Curated annotation (Swiss-Prot):
Gene this chain is encoded by: fabA
Its job: Necessary for the introduction of cis unsaturation into fatty acids. Catalyzes the dehydration of (3R)-3-hydroxydecanoyl-ACP to E-(2)-decenoyl-ACP and then its isomerization to Z-(3)-decenoyl-ACP. Can catalyze the dehydratase reaction for beta-hydroxyacyl-ACPs with saturated chain lengths up to 16:0, being most active on intermediate chain length.
InterPro entries for the chain: FabA, FabA_FabZ, HotDog_dom_sf
GO CC annotation: cytoplasm
Assembly with partners or alone: Homodimer.
PANTHER family: 3-HYDROXYACYL-[ACYL-CARRIER-PROTEIN] DEHYDRATASE, 3-HYDROXYDECANOYL-[ACYL-CARRIER-PROTEIN] DEHYDRATASE
Pathway recorded for this protein: Lipid metabolism; fatty acid biosynthesis
Keyword Lipid biosynthesis part of the UniProt annotation: yes
Domain of life: Bacteria
MF terms (GO), sorted A to Z: (3R)-hydroxyacyl-[acyl-carrier-protein] dehydratase activity; trans-2-decenoyl-acyl-carrier-protein isomerase activity
Catalytic activity from the UniProt record: a (3R)-hydroxyacyl-[ACP] = a (2E)-enoyl-[ACP] + H2O; (3R)-hydroxydecanoyl-[ACP] = (2E)-decenoyl-[ACP] + H2O; (2E)-decenoyl-[ACP] = (3Z)-decenoyl-[ACP]
Record-given protein name: 3-hydroxydecanoyl-[acyl-carrier-protein] dehydratase
Species of the source: Pseudomonas putida (strain GB-1)
Length: 171
């Protein structure tokens, strides 16, 4: 079977309902926390480390929920949502690889914010570069990522870590 290498909004919504990788496996959050509209490219090869990459996008409109509350009179997308989107994509990569279990963010190394997403922006692009995938008792991916708005890089994160767990009871 050939793996799919791009995913639409509807595909991602299916993933949020647990329908893409099967029950109990990697699942994206539902809207409003789903911070991705499409994955334009996903591969087991390529990226900075030759171990896989993802490119995904979020369309920006002034009526997105977070602009109304962060901050009143000074609307800006919270940086933590961009960071969470990168974790979402690393977890998606694990599910796409066929690794069983529910995804959980496990941390990151250095995170830098040097720009912002305003309501006037059109598109956020996420670039994820897989550094390592551990398979065994613990299934986990480690990646570096970046967030760009309208073609300008504004956040970076090193050492994004996400694991998938068949039981999260004792997590």
């Amino acid at each position: 079977m050939t793996k799919q290498h791009a995913f639409t909004r509807e595909d991602l919504l299916r993933c949020s309902r647990g329908e893409l990788f099967g029950p109990g496996n990697a699942q994206l959050p539902a809207p409003n926390m789903l911070m991705v509209d499409r994955i334009t490219h996903i591969s087991e090869e390529g990226g900075k480390y030759g171990k896989g990459e993802l490119v995904a996008e979020l369309d920006i409109t002034p009526d997105l929920w977070f602009f109304a509350c962060h901050f009143e009179g000074d609307p800006v997308m919270p940086g933590c949502l961009g960071l969470d989107a990168m974790w979402q994509l690393v977890g998606f990569f694990l599910g796409w690889q066929g690794l069983p279990g529910r995804g959980r963010a496990l941390g990151s190394g250095e995170v830098k914010f040097f720009g912002q997403v305003l309501p006037s922006a059109k598109k956020v692009t996420y670039n994820i570069h897989i550094k390592r995938v551990l398979k065994g008792k613990l299934n986990m991916a480690i990646a570096d990522g970046s967030v760009s708005v309208d073609g300008r890089e504004i956040y970076t994160a090193e050492g994004l870590r996400v694991g998938v767990f068949t039981s999260t009871d004792n997590f």
